[in-house]
UniProtKB/Swiss-Prot annotation:
It catalyses: estrone 3-sulfate(out) + glutarate(in) = estrone 3-sulfate(in) + glutarate(out); 17beta-estradiol 17-O-(beta-D-glucuronate)(out) + glutarate(in) = 17beta-estradiol 17-O-(beta-D-glucuronate)(in) + glutarate(out); 5alpha-androstane-3alpha,17beta-diol 3-O-(beta-D-glucuronate)(out) + glutarate(in) = 5alpha-androstane-3alpha,17beta-diol 3-O-(beta-D-glucuronate)(in) + glutarate(out); dehydroepiandrosterone 3-sulfate(out) + glutarate(in) = dehydroepiandrosterone 3-sulfate(in) + glutarate(out). One of its GO terms (molecular function) is transmembrane transporter activity. Renal transmembrane organic anion/dicarboxylate exchanger that participates in the reabsorption of conjugated steroids, as well as bile acids, driven by an outward gradient of dicarboxylates such as glutarate or succinate. Transports androstanediol glucuronide (5alpha-androstane-3alpha,17beta-diol 3-O-(beta-D-glucuronate)), estrone 3-sulfate, and estradiol-17-glucuronide (17beta-estradiol 17-O-(beta-D-glucuronate)), but not taurocholate. PROSITE patterns: MFS. Its main location: membrane. The chain crosses the membrane at residues 16-36, 146-166, 174-194, 204-224, 235-255, 260-280, 349-369, 380-400, 407-427, 436-456, 473-493, 495-515. Keywords: Cell membrane, Ion transport, Lipid metabolism, Lipid transport, Membrane, Steroid metabolism, Transmembrane, Transmembrane helix, Transport. InterPro entries: MFS_dom, MFS_sugar_transport-like, MFS_trans_sf. It comes from Microcebus murinus (Gray mouse lemur). It is a multi-pass membrane protein. The lineage of its organism: Eukaryota, Metazoa, Chordata, Craniata, Vertebrata. One of its GO terms (cellular component) is plasma membrane. GO terms for biological process: monoatomic ion transport; steroid metabolic process; sterol transmembrane transport. This is Steroid transmembrane transporter SLC22A24. Disulfide bonds: none annotated.
Amino acid sequence: MAFAVLLDQVGSLGRFQILQLAFLCIANILLFPHILLENFTAAVPGHRCWVHILDNDTVSHNDTGTLGQDALLRISIPLDSNLKPEKCRRFVHPQWQLLHLNRTFSNTSEPDTEPCVDGWVYEQSSFFSTVVTEWDLVCEWESQKSVVQSLFMAGSLLGSVIFGYLSDRFGRKMICSWCLLQLAISDTCAAFAPTFSVYCSLRFLAGSCVMTIMGHSFLLVIEWTNPQSRSMVTTLLLCASSVGQMLLGGLAFVIQDWRTLQLTVSIPIFVIFLSSRWLVESARWLITYNQLDKGLKELRRAARINGKKNAGEILTIEFLRSAMQEELDAARSQASIFCLFHAPRLRMIVLYLGFVRLAVSVPLYGLIFNLQYLGRNIYLFQVLFGAITATARFVALLVMNYMGRRISQVLFLLPVGLFILVNTFLDQEMQTLRTILATLGAGVLCIATTSGSVHFSELIPTVLRGTGGGINILFSRIGAALAPLLMIFVGFSPYLPWITYGVFPILAGLVVLLLPETKNLPLPNTIQDVENDRKETRKVKQEDNCMKVTQF
């Protein structure tokens, strides 16, 4: 924890940290659209069966007389229960007699129908083309659309664990750069995918990178900043993700061809990858892993950018060894993923944080699915949701700095549960009130998740922060997968899934109370920092290190 002393020497929030933060914010803005891309590239437009008499360009007007499109549609496509044209069936033969019958007249004999053996005709008012129209993922193949999102989520789950572990072994910058390259290549190739299976495979590879890059961007910022600034930089990075949501809505509105949209959001990632060479590795991680020469080099680089001219004389190998002696001694025993669950206090923290992340993800994704019924303009909704979450992030910053990490989460998690429970029992006709409550719930959940992200980074030690982040994302992905599965309970009661969504954040709020407060405390570097009485240990060490700095 003596790294705070080193930060004071090089500048804990100067030009260096601002430049690093600005670059990673831009990266997050360009990265987040890749997570929600299937909202547009895999959207399902209105469709019906292809009909020879209606859609064959070689059929002359003389063959159909003076009949208009509506009349031809009526004799070719049966109506569903809502008196809308069927999406997956057509008449075997044109039913001319229907032209002389009232729509609601029930005939004694039902005309023969058949599946869409000749394909489908798609509406192009909202989407010119999507992967659904490209490979006809409708009707009996409709479930294939969810395969893309499931594989992307599976890739995210697997990548967060693997790359999280590797980042604790080989550094944040190296893994972040590799993931940027992998994402750029895989999603660019996805724009030219010849088959649906190839497209799914490429999106799986992309999914394994996106959350890893975003998670490591937090590490590369918070491990270079002082305790007072961590909540602010975390909030700014999360706000960048919200801006990315709004950017995606605007791009998708302008570019309605899925391949062009896929390519448009993928090419800039190559630029981010090439620019990542100027990222500075976490000196905290380098020193904790006994790479003193490299750590000293990065510290001097940060001091030079921050204008700390005298820092070069103070920052020496001997000074690093003296200030970080306890951390260096602890680094001799290599930490592994098993250490997260071996040390009793750390195990308790990891499990509590994991449950909170899971319990927040379940209602968050449940509300996202519900918010999609705000209207038919999906582009406007995407921009609106980004604006709501961005506003919520700034509210979170104010509350965190005033009330601390723990109380701020409890303050917002409990009302979320109440919003959902009240919404569950409101009459379906009260759409305006239901929409307001759902939107408030989503915004308040974003406040809680922002505070939770800061809380997590301040509880897990540096030697395992990447691995711990992977485990935390794993719990988040499990919660995201549970959200739609809970709708199975509708078969027992239409209220049961929503009651479950409401109970989860209430339980999460109670569990947060079991976690220690971390406001304005230095980051733990080793497992011993977490296991010991942290507040007392930190106070003594800071006083001792101040004496060492004075001596130098």
